[in-house]
A protein has these predicted regions:
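His/Asp/Glu-rich, glycine-adjacent segments
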Residues: 2-173, 247-441
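Short, structured active-site-proximal loop/turn typified by the sulfatase FGly-forming signature C/S-X-P-X-R
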Residues: 34-39, 202-258, 312-314
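Active-site-proximal N-terminal segment of extracellular/periplasmic enzymes that hydrolyze or transfer
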Residues: 164-227, 234
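Histidine-centered active-site microenvironments of extracellular/periplasmic hydrolases
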Residues: 178-180, 471-518, 552, 568-572
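Beta-strand elements within well-structured catalytic alpha/beta cores of enzymes
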Residues: 184-205, 218-220, 243, 306, ...
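Short, solvent-exposed turn/loop segments enriched in Gly/Ser/Thr/Pro and often Arg
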Residues: 225-247, 316-326, 416-419, 481-485, ...
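Substrate-binding rim/cap in mid-to-C-terminal beta-strand-loop elements of soluble/periplasmic
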Residues: 463, 496-545, 562
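Polar, surface-exposed loop/tail segments
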Residues: 484-490, 527-534, 542-577
Length: 578
């Protein structure tokens, strides 16, 4: 049974590797280039699939009325295992296509559709072959063996041929980010964007209804709010790249949380399949995750667009800003705190622009270090350093943003808060026990306030921003993606091969939200559902700038009062990239 299990595991592994290649169309089909992929990713899967196949055969043995003893390479056994592998491969291919369709080009979508159909046909062929082998007995042994090889070979070769030899990604070219001879506009309206990773509108509504998070409640009562559809994969880098550019990953170039390098060398991967524990490859060291840099973006972000049109911008704690891009204003990357811990980073950090702003940043950190109040009081929850560090990071960047905004007075500020994502993964269960069917004991019940404490930091920031708004100013509170309870199956997987404490997830792309507050904003909760790519067009519209026709998002004029929109029609420009 072992040899049959290994053969079936190898076939199933080939199907997974095909999906990996389909999701990474730039990967060339050259044996020397594919070797590292096979020896790392392939090795990981062939072992697991062989074990699964062996378990299935043992279960078959236990359920059989007669002794089941297949040959070393049994045509009948391999036909049934091949049928299961091909069916699972077709389902995996189709599920990844449905999930990632918006980040794939049309050629890849077509190849995956046809590849899934090929594997489905192969599964049916394997079933018919197994029936023929059983019906005709030993007389059909060799013809069936030949047919088995043909079906297996074609089930691999056809999807690979449909995928093609690999496509070279074109180089992007665009103008410089700052038009230094551009005359800045007058004082005008100001925009304050508070961005949140993993914020849940349902959690906020429930907390405000019970009298907590008062500033969120003020926005809900006197501002506008709508849900935001997010994207797959739901990583902060991919989601915020879409929000900051108004373009989907196919255009902005950011398709995942990072670039994945094979541990044994070879070409990098940009996208990993889901529904097959592929991200465990990073956890187990088969793949090395390299963070994106500011050079990854293939189009202009909002701060670059505004800078070229004379608006001063202040951006703090954003991904894809290392090294910090040149803007009319300032940028502090989300890598600053990590780099500041190195000798070179403390002196002249590439995570801060302009360089003279580093004095203001250092002063903000010194002021914060004088405070001893933790984000979550020790009496409330004994957090380990990994989880508490997320709160410390948010407090530090919050203080940096306040210091720089006070000194430099930008017209548009964009400040991001990350801790809800990290904390939500581990403490959602205690904040929403009814969603997990749990009855918490006293120890775990004390942890129920941990998540809300981190919402409280953002609630304070919202309160300060509201107090600073002028009659023509607007505040946007944007959560690029939500957080929801992890289902039982995923929790079991995490307990076996992952992190047993994890209970919150955003793998299924739960909705985020966008709140607007200010004199020009219409009141009420909007029933329409926006998308993360609508954020940048909406900001451009409010500031009186045209919308790029190559943007995938739309200006959400329904956030504003009719007296505002009647005097400000939507205008367009072909693109901001040249």
């Amino acid at each position: 049974m072992l040899s049959n299990s290994i053969a079936a595991g190898a076939l199933a592994t080939a199907y997974v590797l095909i999906v990996v290649m389909q999701l990474n169309p730039a990967l060339p089909l050259e044996p020397a280039r594919l070797g590292p992929l096979v020896t790392t990713v392939g090795l990981f899967y062939v072992v697991h699939f062989a074990v699964i196949s062996y378990v299935l055969l043992v279960a078959r043995q236990l359920a059989a009325r007669e002794v089941f003893s297949p040959a070393w390479l049994s045509v009948g056994t391999l036909a049934w295992l091949g049928a299961l592998a091909a069916a699972a491969g077709a389902a995996l291919m189709w599920a990844n296509l449905a999930t990632f369709a918006r980040v794939l080009d049309a050629e890849t979508v077509t190849a995956m559709m046809r590849g899934a159909a090929t594997l489905a046909l192969a599964s049916v062929s394997f079933v018919l072959l197994a029936w023929a082998r059983r019906a005709f007995g030993r007389d059909a042994r060799w013809p069936c063996a030949f047919a088995l090889l043909v079906i297996a070979g074609l089930s691999i070769a056809v999807p690979v041929a449909l995928r093609g030899p690999g496509r070279v990604q074109p180089l992007e070219a665009r103008t410089l980010d700052i038009a230094t001879d551009f005359t800045p506009p007058g004082r005008g309206s100001r925009v304050n964007v508070i961005a949140i990773d993993g914020g849940s509108l349902d959690f906020i509504v429930r907390a405000t209804a019970e009298g907590r998070l008062p500033n969120f409640g003020r926005v809900l009562d006197s501002g506008a709010v709508m849900r935001l559809a997010t994207i797959h994969p739901t990583s902060a880098e991919a989601v915020w790249a879409a929000a900051l550019t108004g373009k989907l990953p196919l255009k902005n170039g950011v398709r995942s949380a990072g670039i994945y390098h094979l541990a044994t060398g070879g070409d990098a991967l940009q996208l990993l399949p889901i529904y097959c524990v592929a991200y465990q490859l990073v956890r187990f060291g088969f793949l090395v995750d390299e963070p994106h840099t500011s050079a990854t973006l293939r189009t202009r972000a909002i701060w670059s667009i505004l800078s070229t049109h004379g608006f001063s911008v202040g951006a703090v704690d954003w991904p894809l800003t290392q090294p910090a891009p040149a803007v009319r204003g300032y940028v502090v990357s989300d890598t600053y705190l990590r780099l500041a811990g190195t000798p070179s980073g403390a002196v002249d950090s590439p995570a801060v622009y302009p360089s003279e702003a580093q004095e203001d940043v250092a002063r903000a950190i010194e002021d914060l270090s004088a405070e001893t109040r933790p984000v979550v009081p020790a009496s409330v929850a004994p957090l380990d350093d990994r989880r508490e560090s997320a709160g410390r990071s948010d407090r530090t960047y919050d203080r940096i943003a306040r210091e720089l905004a006070e000194v430099r007075q930008p017209q548009v500020t964009l400040t991001r808060y990350q801790s809800l994502d990290t904390i939500g993964h581990y403490f959602l269960r205690y904040a929403m026990p009814s969603e997990f069917g749990d009855a918490l004991d006293d120890e775990h019940r004390a942890l129920g306030t941990v998540l809300e404490q981190h919402y409280g930091l953002i609630d304070d920031a919202i309160g300060r921003t509201i107090a600073s708004l002028g009659p023509d100013d607007v505040m946007l509170v944007v959560s690029g993606f939500g957080m929801e309870p992890m289902n039982l199956w995923k929790r079991l997987i995490e307990r076996v091969i992952g992190d047993p404490d994890m209970n919150g997830t955003h793998d299924a792309a739960p909705d985020g939200f966008m709140m607007a507050y200010g004199a020009p904003v219409a009141r009420g909760r909007l029933s329409t559902r926006a998308a993360v790519v609508d954020v940048t067009p909406t900001i451009l519209y409010f500031l009186g700038l045209p919308i790029g026709r190559d943007m995938d998002g739309y200006a959400r004029t329904d956030l504003f009062q009719h007296t505002f929109t009647d005097e400000r029609p939507i205008t367009f420009i072909p693109t901001y990239d040249r």
